[in-house]
Amino acid sequence: MSLSALESTINSAFDARDGVSTTTKGEIRDAVESALELLDKGEARVAERGTDGTWSVNQWLKKAVLLSFRLNDMSVIPGGPGQASWWDKVPSKFEGWGENRFREAGFRAVPGAIVRRSAFIAKNVVLMPSFVNLGAYVDEATMVDTWSTVGSCAQIGKRVHISGGVGIGGVLEPLQAGPVIIEDDCFIGARSEVAEGVVVRKGAVLAMGVFLGASTKVIDRETGETFVGEVPEYAVVVPGALPGKPMKNGQIGPSTACAVIVKRVDERTRSKTSINELLRD
């Protein structure tokens, strides 16, 4: 089935999703399974970057993921610690894999790394004990460090370092919401959170503990420019706070969190300078 035929079938099935269930067979099930296989192999992805730098979302692939929850019944997933099992609708990406399959895939998956089927992991990725949700895309030579989460449909670029305990938000619903996107060569500091469709542009550095959502203000302290929903290329960002506004009693109100661009670097400087040096003020 061609991509256009897959898209048409999935869009029609999603419009009539109340009639889709675990007993549904035939064209709809085949189309959803084909779409998930394309995602799993990296032959299709939920979001794609255009030549002008804008990202477009393939909503039909998100619909395929959502339809899979209606099509698939709960089942026992063995292999837990202490001979325990899990109970879910989504199998592991690694189900049935042996040495040859892992060698062909070309990435490392440390014990404790969990990847759900339909997530794509590119060559030379290192997965420490972490969680990668369905529909996500993790590109070449990226590190996903311990206890980090890559949410559903999130798009992670090449040579990205996702430090320990980072949360990269996922999105399936609402359909119009875009996924979190971390472009190539970014560094996401430990315990940071990037959610609600924020785009972190190429080469940006987030210090430890930066929290970014769709409404978080990212302020360039040199120019005063404010960004919302996006971190510019090669920006070095630290946690910050905006001063509180006066309350009715005349006292200064509580401050609100923001993120602060403390400097910007070019590609050459970014490639030759350690992260610690960049974050020194």
UniProtKB/Swiss-Prot annotation:
It is found in: Cytoplasm. InterPro entries: DapD_Trfase_Hexpep_rpt_fam, Hexapep, THP_succinylTrfase_dom1, THP_succinylTrfase_N_sf, Trimer_LpxA-like_sf. Its main location: cytoplasm. Gene3D superfamilies: Hexapeptide repeat proteins (2.160.10.10), Tetrahydrodipicolinate-N-succinyltransferase, N-terminal domain (1.10.166.10). GO terms for cellular component: cytoplasm. Pathway: Amino-acid biosynthesis; L-lysine biosynthesis via DAP pathway; LL-2,6-diaminopimelate from (S)-tetrahydrodipicolinate (succinylase route): step 1/3. Pfam families: Hexapep_2, THDPS_N_2. CDD domains: LbH_THP_succinylT. The keyword Acyltransferase applies. It comes from the Bacteria. The keyword Phosphoprotein does not apply. Keywords: Acyltransferase, Amino-acid biosynthesis, Cytoplasm, Diaminopimelate biosynthesis, Lysine biosynthesis, Repeat, Transferase. Substrate binds at residues 108, 145. Signal peptide: none annotated. SUPFAM superfamilies: Trimeric LpxA-like enzymes. Its EC number is 2.3.1.117. Belongs to the transferase hexapeptide repeat family. Homotrimer. PANTHER family: 2,3,4,5-TETRAHYDROPYRIDINE-2,6-DICARBOXYLATE N-SUCCINYLTRANSFERASE, MOLYBDENUM COFACTOR GUANYLYLTRANSFERASE. This is 2,3,4,5-tetrahydropyridine-2,6-dicarboxylate N-succinyltransferase. It comes from Bradyrhizobium sp. (strain BTAi1 / ATCC BAA-1182).
